[in-house]
Structures are given as structure tokens and as C-alpha cells.
């Protein structure tokens, strides 16, 4: 008995020492305050960070102007010096709004001017360009208005391709299409590509919609697009919200299946994974026939998957999805292996909107997961509001409430998991910012890129909030030492 007790003490001490040793290998720096839901956005609307030389430029929603449950926040810009490990000047770039979709994105153009775009939710938004190269200045006097797209924009996401700059976006409301615009090196204005990538409801699938994520290929000549689909059901017909797998009304809080589309950015042609040429825009029938990677058979997600190129240069996906019931969720790594798509479980999660991230470095996959043992449900969920309005609580299994407005799109603790083959995964470490405790939740992990679109594999950002009455919020910058 004594020997067993000694062994337990030694094992516990060893585990604590190992975690302390890992803690020394990274540092986390906090920035910003007064944030809203999506203080830093999920992968549909990126980037909020840009590295150039020893500087990391950051934009976010912050500096709230009221204490409402859904506060008004402003687009804020700041910078971080990698040598001095200090933040620079911080100030707002525009007026306050309670719409979290107004979160800014940032990039540098070919003239090395900093660009910021914000305030877009089915609207044209506001585009700012720095007057000086690679400088955010000290006030709005250091910026000028830019010319952006002449079309309604939602979820804008910027990338630098081999053929010029790319903005991928949804063109209007939920049931409209997704498309992209290009700006070549010698051009002043953006050109929206005439034909959308997807328009799911154009062939009779009334109000069918999708959410998208994308990355560029390593050579930046192709676009890897992942999307998930759902019935947007604007008429709020309870029958259309019914999920047969779970025998529940779940509303459009959940999206289904996993689809893939490849775009040649030089020719603007589209292909499925196997190289079949496809006619754009993709409707739901074509998606189900030629683009589907995973028929989830009623298992739902909220956020579209994170995409990565695997060891063989093929697209692979980190996806969170429901399991045997609506209150159990799991992360999967989906990759093409032995002529089929394999779905390898990694770890459980607590919300369908948890925004994890994944990188490949030193011949290993590193997944940074948002985790939690208790599923978060809030009175602000779209499903909850609908069920309350319709008196349908008894029809659902998801009516336990445990969160506030900031928890509407998930949140939890951060864990790093590692795999050499993408099949077998092992826990590596927890990532906990200083001066936070168990009352804090974190979300929307985002690896930083430079102005050429190259991923910085030892630096990412995320945001967090205190679920106690203080309602603190903060952005965080993670750096491997």
C-alpha cells in the first residue's frame, strides 16, 4: 500500500514537472478589452493579424461603449513588437456597433500599405488604407478611404495568391451565393469573378444555404474550399427543422455534410477532389453528387472545417461534429488514405461552433482544440429563441441552458494534440494564459500569416472572456519560445 502511494506521488509529480517544462516553451501576451462575441472572428472571416519583420499588426472588436448583454464595440488596431515583446499604439478606426460581423480584417497590399476592412454584413463595409508603408500610425489621420467591392459583402476573407490578391465572401444574405474577387499586382481596383462558386438553392432547393472556409494551396495557385449545408428555413416551418437522426427540432444551429471544391485561380475553373471538371455555380444536387467528402447522415456542425494540406499535398480537414446525441460532440481529422476518406477521432468538444486550428510542422500534425466537458447551451441560441416562440420545448433535447451571450458560439479550454500520421492522436499540453482561471473560456484560434500569405507556425491569436459577473474580455497572442 505504501509503495503504491509512493508510486502515485511520483507519477503526479512527474506529470506536473512535465507540464511546467512545457509551459516554459511558450508565452502568451494579452491585448485589448471590452470585446464582444467574435472579438476575433472565426475562420469564415480572416485575418485579424499580419506579421511583417518584427511587427505583428492586430485588429479586433473592442472598447465597448455600453454594458448591454450585446454591447457595442469598435474596430481597434494595435501592434506587437517581437523583439521587445511589447504592444504599440492602440486606437479605434470607426464607430461602434453591436453587430459582431463588423469585425475588421487586415492585410498588406503590393505597395506595402496596410489595409483594414470592417463593417460588412450584407453591406459594402468600410475600407481603409494606411498613408505610410507598413505603418498603422497613431490616429485616423494616418489613413485614407479605399475603394472596395460594389456589392454586398458578408464574411470577407483575404489571401495572397500567385496571381494577385483574393477576397472570398458571401454575396449578400444567407441564401445568396459565395464568390471571390481578385486584384492583380498592377491593378488598382478589385474585380469580382462573374460566376459564384456555390449557389445551393438555384435548382429548386428552396432556401438551402451553406457556410464556407478556404485556404490556398502551398503554391498559391489553387483555392481549397470546404463547405457545409443547411436549410435556412426563413418561414420557420418546424417540420423543416426536424432532425430524424436525433428525433428533435434543432433549427439551423446545425449544418450538415462536408463538401470540397477546388478552384484554379488562373483559369477560374472548378474541380472536385478527383479532378472532375465542374460547372459553376455548384448547386445542392451537384454538391451531393460530386463534392461530398462526408455524408454526416444528420450529424451536425456549426462552423465549417479548418483545411490543411496533408503530407501528400491533399486537402485534409479538422471538423467538429455531433455524435450519438445532439449534446455530444467530437473533433475528427478527415484525410484521404488508401483510396478513401478516413475520419479519425481526436477528442470530445462542447459546442458545434468551437473554432480550433491545425498546422503541420516538423513532420507532425498539431491540432489546437477548444475543449470542455459540459455542452454549452444559452438562451441566445437561435434554436432556443425559436423553440420558446413556438412553444416547442418538449420537442427538443437541447433545452438545458448553461451560458450567456458570449457563449452563443461555444468556447472552452485550449489543448494541443499531436499526431505523426493523422490517425492516432495524443494529448500534448494545455494552453492557459496567465491571470485567467476556470471562469475563463476561449475560442477562435487563428494562426498568423505574413504579407505573402505564409503561415507562421509558432504564433497564433485567440480571444477569451470571463463568464463571471465582471464580464472581462481579452485577445491573446501565443508565441512558441
Where are these regions (language model features)?
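Extracellular, repeat-based ectodomains that mediate carbohydrate processing or recognition
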Residues: 19-481
Amino acid at each position: 500500500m505504501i509503495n503504491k502511494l509512493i508510486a502515485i506521488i511520483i507519477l503526479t509529480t512527474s506529470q506536473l514537472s512535465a507540464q511546467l517544462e512545457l509551459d516554459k516553451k511558450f508565452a502568451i501576451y494579452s491585448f485589448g478589452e471590452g470585446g464582444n462575441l467574435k472579438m476575433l472572428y472565426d475562420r469564415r472571416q480572416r485575418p485579424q493579424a499580419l506579421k511583417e519583420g518584427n511587427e505583428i499588426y492586430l485588429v479586433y472588436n473592442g472598447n465597448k461603449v455600453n454594458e448591454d448583454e450585446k454591447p457595442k464595440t469598435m474596430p481597434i488596431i494595435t501592434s506587437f513588437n517581437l523583439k521587445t515583446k511589447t504592444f504599440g499604439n492602440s486606437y479605434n478606426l470607426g464607430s461602434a456597433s453591436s453587430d459582431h460581423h463588423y469585425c475588421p480584417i487586415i492585410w498588406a497590399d503590393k505597395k506595402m500599405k496596410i489595409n483594414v476592412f470592417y463593417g460588412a454584413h450584407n453591406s459594402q463595409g468600410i475600407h481603409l488604407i494606411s498613408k505610410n508603408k507598413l505603418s498603422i500610425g497613431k490616429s485616423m489621420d494616418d489613413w485614407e478611404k479605399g475603394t472596395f467591392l460594389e456589392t454586398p459583402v458578408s464574411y470577407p476573407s483575404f489571401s495572397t495568391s500567385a496571381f494577385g490578391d483574393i477576397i472570398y465572401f458571401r454575396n449578400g444574405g444567407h441564401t445568396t451565393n459565395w464568390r471571390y474577387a481578385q486584384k492583380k499586382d498592377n491593378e488598382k481596383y478589385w474585380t469580382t469573378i462573374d460566376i459564384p462558386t456555390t449557389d445551393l438553392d438555384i435548382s429548386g432547393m428552396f432556401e438551402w444555404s451553406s457556410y464556407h472556409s478556404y485556404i490556398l494551396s502551398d503554391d498559391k495557385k489553387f483555392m481549397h474550399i470546404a463547405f457545409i449545408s443547411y436549410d435556412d428555413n426563413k418561414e420557420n416551418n418546424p417540420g423543416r427543422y426536424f432532425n430524424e437522426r436525433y428525433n428533435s427540432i434543432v433549427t439551423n444551429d446545425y449544418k450538415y455534410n462536408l463538401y470540397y471544391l477546388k478552384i484554379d485561380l488562373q483559369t477560374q475553373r472548378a474541380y472536385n477532389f478527383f479532378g472532375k471538371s465542374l460547372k459553376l455555380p455548384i448547386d445542392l444536387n451537384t454538391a451531393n453528387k460530386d463534392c461530398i467528402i462526408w455524408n454526416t447522415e444528420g450529424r451536425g456542425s456549426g462552423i465549417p472545417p479548418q483545411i490543411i494540406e496533408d503530407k501528400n499535398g491533399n486537402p485534409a480537414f479538422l471538423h467538429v461534429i455531433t455524435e450519438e446525441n445532439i449534446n455530444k460532440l467530437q473533433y475528427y481529422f478527415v484525410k484521404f488514405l488508401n483510396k478513401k476518406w478516413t475520419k479519425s477521432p481526436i477528442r470530445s468538444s462542447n459546442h458545434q461552433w468551437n473554432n480550433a486550428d491545425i498546422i503541420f510542422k516538423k513532420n507532425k500534425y498539431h491540432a489546437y482544440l477548444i475543449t470542455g466537458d459540459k455542452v454549452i447551451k444559452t438562451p441566445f441560441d437561435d434554436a432556443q429563441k425559436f423553440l420558446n416562440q413556438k412553444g416547442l420545448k418538449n420537442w427538443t433535447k437541447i433545452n438545458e441552458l448553461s451560458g450567456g451571450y458570449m457563449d452563443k458560439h461555444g468556447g472552452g479550454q485550449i489543448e494541443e494534440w499531436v499526431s505523426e500520421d493523422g490517425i492516432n492522436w495524443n494529448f500534448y499540453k494545455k494552453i492557459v494564459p496567465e491571470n485567467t482561471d476556470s471562469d475563463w473560456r476561449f475560442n477562435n484560434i487563428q494562426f498568423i500569416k505574413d504579407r505573402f500569405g505564409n503561415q507562421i507556425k509558432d504564433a497564433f491569436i485567440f480571444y477569451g472572456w470571463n463568464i463571471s459577473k465582471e464580464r472581462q474580455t481579452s485577445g491573446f497572442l501565443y508565441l512558441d519560445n
